[in-house]
Amino acid sequence: MILAEGVQKFSLFFLEGAVLVGALGVVLLPNILYSAFLLGGVLMSIAGIYLLLNADFVAAAQVLIYVGAINVLILFAIMLVNKNDGRVAAGTSNSSGVTNNIIGLTCIGLAGFLIDMIVTTPWLPKGVAVATSLSAKADSTAAQTQLKGSISIIGLHIFSDFLLPFEVISLLLLVTLVGAIVIARRERLSDLEISKISLLNLPDPSNGKTPSLK
């Protein structure tokens, strides 16, 4: 995408801020349905960043696959499993503190692993360098063309050099879907238990007394 330098910087900062705020909302909001909608906004913002990087195919794949398929699947799972508004009921969690600590450490480890991979990955192919003199302008243009690549080159790199991060992201999306179903299912079971207790506490119409739960 060809834009003025100032517009590019502003758009990049805006999209990065949208990704950060949306990601925090996905994690912190108590309503899982709102979190799913914010997840769609995060994925759309990432697609916008791809457009700024002239990765049109990757941006289109991001919208079609992640927003149009995976995020919609998560929304369907939430709305079909959970009959209420998706709010996590307080005090219904049976997870122990040890389990929560393990989950937190696992998330921190995955985040550190991805950050280390981003920092240490050689994003430029070997032998391709940025030209810094007028005599190297032709080589720089050829390198730029080579870096744009084609669909076949993208597929080759995804399933060779970047296979591990690709599978890690797929695993994270699977965990997100399973977690959404578990949270929604847990609240539904809690509501059923409350309904059963309410039925047991209904007064007996014959004598007007409340039956005992013993």
From Swiss-Prot:
It comes from the Eukaryota. The chain crosses the membrane at residues 10-30, 32-52, 61-81, 102-122, 163-183. It is a multi-pass membrane protein. The keyword ATP-binding does not apply. Pfam families: Oxidored_q3. It is an enzyme of class 7 (translocase). It is found in: Plastid, Chloroplast thylakoid membrane. It catalyses: a plastoquinone + NADH + (n+1) H(+)(in) = a plastoquinol + NAD(+) + n H(+)(out); a plastoquinone + NADPH + (n+1) H(+)(in) = a plastoquinol + NADP(+) + n H(+)(out). Its EC number is 7.1.1.-. One of its GO terms (molecular function) is quinone binding. One of its GO terms (cellular component) is chloroplast thylakoid membrane. Keywords: Chloroplast, Membrane, NAD, NADP, Plastid, Plastoquinone, Quinone, Thylakoid, Translocase, Transmembrane, Transmembrane helix, Transport. Belongs to the complex I subunit 6 family. NCBIfam families: PRK06638.1-3 (NF005163). NDH shuttles electrons from NAD(P)H:plastoquinone, via FMN and iron-sulfur (Fe-S) centers, to quinones in the photosynthetic chain and possibly in a chloroplast respiratory chain. The immediate electron acceptor for the enzyme in this species is believed to be plastoquinone. Couples the redox reaction to proton translocation, and thus conserves the redox energy in a proton gradient. This is NAD(P)H-quinone oxidoreductase subunit 6, chloroplastic. The gene is ndhG.
